[in-house]
């Protein structure tokens, strides 16, 4: 299950993206962890190109 605020790491570039908003049923708006590098992607595409990073728990 994907939700706003989830972090994903691109498998090819190593960049970390955060889900900022969801548009429609399948489109996600991602923003780079440092505030740069925005992109739109589908949920299916995100699962193929990125891996979800688990939240840090103390």
Where do the model's predicted regions map?
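Basic/aromatic-rich interaction segments and small domains that mediate binding to polyanionic partners
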Residues: 4-42
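Intrinsically disordered, low-complexity, charged/polar segments
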Residues: 32-58
